[in-house]
Structures are given as C-alpha cells and as structure tokens.
Amino acid sequence: MNQPTTAPPRTRTEPKTERPRLWKVILLNDDYTPREFVVMVLKAVFHMGEEKAYAVMLTAHRRGACVIAVFARDIADTKAKEATELGKAKGYPLYFTTEPEE
C-alpha cells in the first residue's frame, strides 16, 4: 500500500538587506596648499562646480575641516586617497580623511 506523502510547507523568506554604513570624506585645512589648488582638486575628484568647491574650501579654511561628501566606505576611502595623492604629487600637505557617519 502506498502511504500518502505530505510535502513540507513552503515558506518564503526574504533576505534582510541592510544599507551599508556611510562614511564622510573630510577635508582638513593646512596653511600651505593654495586655495586655487584645493578648489581644483574638489572639482576634479568630487565633481563639484566652481562655486560649491570654493565654498567648501572656505569652510575648511575657517573651521579647520569640512565634510565634503558621504559615500559607502570603499568609495569614500578611494576618493579621499585620490584627492590626497593629487596634493602629494604637487608637494602640498593637502589631506582628506574619512570617518563613519553617525
């Protein structure tokens, strides 16, 4: 005799996807890098317009630091490194860093 078979109940589980933690890219002020060069780097690496780049540069100059943008960690690290390397290549102490957004 055949016994009836019962299939286990089908359940659909949706994987929980969490948003990646975001990281801030921060421009640190120094007294040696020319303002024009900082603006050029902001335009080249962060695709800012002239006015926005100038405003960000002035904010960093007046406050000592300024948040440039917020990205996923790998993008933030890459952009901070690229911008810092542009300064190094010209002999300037221009420095960008990253930290987690709260």
Segments predicted by a language model, with ranges:
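Terminal domain-initiation and capping elements
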Residues: 1-102
